[in-house]
Curated annotation (Swiss-Prot):
It comes from Francisella tularensis subsp. mediasiatica (strain FSC147). One of its GO terms (molecular function) is lipoyl(octanoyl) transferase activity. It comes from the Bacteria. It is found in: Cytoplasm. GO terms for biological process: protein modification process. The lineage of its organism: Bacteria, Pseudomonadati, Pseudomonadota, Gammaproteobacteria, Thiotrichales. The active site is at C168 (acyl-thioester intermediate). Its EC number is 2.3.1.181. In the reaction, the free carboxyl group of octanoic acid is attached via an amide linkage to the epsilon-amino group of a specific lysine residue of lipoyl domains of lipoate-dependent enzymes. Pfam families: LplA-B_cat. Its main location: cytoplasm. InterPro entries: aa-tRNA-synth_II/BPL/LPL, BPL_LPL_catalytic, Octanoyltransferase, Octanoyltransferase_CS. This is Octanoyltransferase. Catalyzes the transfer of endogenously produced octanoic acid from octanoyl-acyl-carrier-protein onto the lipoyl domains of lipoate-dependent enzymes. Lipoyl-ACP can also act as a substrate although octanoyl-ACP is likely to be the physiological substrate. It is an enzyme of class 2 (transferase).
Length: 206
């Protein structure tokens, strides 16, 4: 496997990072290194390519951005650890389903290893849950064997805006965050811990 370059973008507007992902993916060559971007976004709702407007109950003036990722509407905001995967999955001999399961399993492993939290998935409702409350959302896009978008892990944030929508298209879905279980939850640590688990799983799968 080629080296994966890791870049910490800090706090960035969603639209800027989305445009950068599109440009990176469209201009990369077979020799381009894979990258993982670590980022935090100001408050924004993002609507997946099959997202339904009725799942946004009241935006409360929070911006809404249409994207080309999978899934329905979700919320990003300060205190949420976001990780984007810009990978050549064809070169890595990694199918779309395997990528999704690796993204999910890395989060489950991280929560267990570093925080002693037993997380799980729910069939038909992608994401990571603790006691059936969603702690992480994921949405990916694969174009010509190249992936972008990623996972958002609720870490230490205001969860209120999730009540303004039907998260991921599910009415009444309860959300949680790492700070509910670990008061000193820090997004930088979560991003590094998650990335380490993801890369380990990725290397073991190819």
């Amino acid at each position: 496997m080629n080296n994966i370059y890791q870049e910490d973008l800090g706090l960035q507007q969603y639209t800027k990072v989305f445009e950068d992902m599109l440009e990176f993916t469209s201009t990369r060559t077979p020799e381009t290194n894979d990258e993982i971007w670590l980022v935090e976004h100001p408050a924004v709702f993002t609507q997946g390519k099959h997202g339904k407007p009725e799942h946004i109950l009241n935006s409360h003036n929070i911006p809404i951005v249409a994207t080309d990722r999978g899934g329905q509407v979700t919320y990003h905001g300060p205190g949420q650890a976001v990780i984007y995967f810009l990978l050549d999955i064809k070169r890595n001999k990694l199918g779309a389903k395997k990528l999704v399961t690796t993204v999910e399993q890395a989060c489950i492993n991280m929560l267990d290893k570093y925080y002693n939290l037993k997380a799980h998935i729910i069939d038909g409702a992608h994401g990571i849950y603790i006691n059936n409350q969603k702690i992480a959302s994921l949405g990916l896009r694969i174009k010509q064997g190249k992936s972008y978008h990623g996972i958002a892990i609720n870490t230490n944030m205001d969860l209120t805006p999730f009540s303004y929508i039907n998260p991921c298209g599910y009415s009444g879905l309860k959300m949680c965050q790492l700070a509910n279980f670990y008061q000193e939850a820090d997004i930088k640590k979560v991003q590094q811990q998650y990335t380490a688990e993801f890369v380990t799983l990725l290397n073991n799968s190819i």
